[in-house]
Amino acid sequence: MYGDFKQHLQHELESIKEAGLYKTERVICSPQRSAIEVAEKECLNFCANNYLGLSDNPRLIEAAKKAMDERGFGMSSVRFICGCQDIHKALEKAIADYFGTEDTILYAACFDANGGVFEPLFTEQDAIISDSLNHASIIDGVRLCKAVRYRYANANMEELEDCLKRAQAQRFRIIVTDGVFSMDGNAAPLDEICRLAKEYRALVMVDECHSAGVLGATGRGITELYNLRGEVDILTGTLGKAFGGAIGGFTTGRKEIIDMLRQRSRPYLFSNSLPPAVVGAGIEMFKMLEESNEHHDRLVENVAFFREKMIAAGFDIKPTVSAICAVMLYDAKLSQDFAAELQKKGIFVTGFYYPVVPKGQARIRVQVSAGHTREQLEKCVAAFIEVGKELGVLK
């Protein structure tokens, strides 16, 4: 039987390669940081989600070691059997305090948090209204739920209002949006979303994965940016991006919502608890962010500097308030060739093209970090200009 299936898979894989969509893994041989070793060559890393530059932070590494020494390597259990240590509860409280919410529940990843949030809370009597560019984990989570589904074009408030009007027959309604959309780097118009939610009696959920640690005066995410702390019912997020870059997801928000997720959210009920090392480092990370805004402030300065230099050089950059800078090239092959040439010059980035982004919208996604020095940013801009001229993007 496998012979026929193998042949089918080989044919599918070959089709993916012929379409130029086959993904290969580039192997890093160093810690994740602003300068990394790839294929025995040092590169400047501009494609990690390491927004606050904490992935190799010595204080977090020591906290992880300490937690492992004191609490062990792993939990060998789900939370409700025997997988809950006091440090798990302490991390949940730290997250709630950071975002100004009532309670928090931890997951193995934010993919699980988004995948496990809808089915326990909503039924066929309810409606989920989702932005068209929401993350794949939200899309999959919505598919697992029997609620009526509505979708509006990215950040289009007229379409959102139309969906809300059509959903008035449902019992409960929830608007779901990414805080920052990962491919364009644009922020959701959360002020308008919350205004419409109040008018049409809807709940609001925001995925803070690319906005937490980045947006707002102190980096507390899109709710801080719009002065809406405590106004959003559900926030999801990750420890795998700005917050140290390891692994782990969370849902934080209204107490009763979190309590129901503890009872019925399947990824929470049937997945091992986060290991003590990750939890211990997470607690220490939030202590660091409470003590100082230096990492966030440096990130803001770096993003402003990079964007200014790239726009002055003549590149087409998507407007954004986030740390994601989408350098638009439009052609899929050009984006791949551009990224390959940059790597030869010691700049580690990735070209994105269909089906990750719409056809004709290929780009290089540059992710700026607080860990980048001014010299590294200048080197990146210079390499972009050089390759841009070589490939005819710049005159």
Give the ranges of each region predicted by the language model.
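PLP-dependent enzyme catalytic core of the Aspartate aminotransferase-like
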Residues: 3, 58, 62-66, 70, ...
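N-terminal "arm"/small-domain region of PLP-dependent enzymes with the aminotransferase-like
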Residues: 9-11, 15-73, 202
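Short loop-beta-helix segment that forms the pyridoxal 5′-phosphate
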Residues: 78-84, 92-116
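Conserved PLP-anchoring active-site segment centered on the Schiff-base-forming lysine
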Residues: 117-136
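Active-site phosphate-binding strand-loop segment of PLP-dependent enzymes
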Residues: 150, 154-206
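Active-site C-terminal subdomain of aminotransferase-like
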Residues: 200-203, 210, 215-321, 334
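Conserved PLP-binding catalytic core of the aspartate aminotransferase-like
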Residues: 297-306, 311-346, 356, 360-361, ...
